[in-house]
């Protein structure tokens, strides 16, 4: 997934940055400037790839700890981990959204699912958040949702 993410991002950035503008003549100054822009773009793409990898790695590690807390019925630990782990997902979400089917599984809100008449398909962090903070319980459904979340996080990673 990381390589695909990088490829998608790099391709998009390169296509946008390397457009062909026939109104400009290609002289040595323009060519050197284009080379500089391409080098900067390549460097920025590498930096963003590294950053995204770091965020997704932390997201997966945190999700594993979060799911373990739920499996152990440790409400306090699950609540302590929730905002930290969500932060890593939010930071990587622009890339995660490129994989359309995974982002809604991980990050959908109930209101959005109801609007699409898909509330029975609701899963992910916000469903578990509801169990922890509104329902104030960890039950078998919460544990099943946590296992699915971990599976989806691994697939995203």
Where does each model-flagged region fall?
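Mature extracytoplasmic or organellar-lumen-exposed domains after removal of signal/transit peptides
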Residues: 32-157
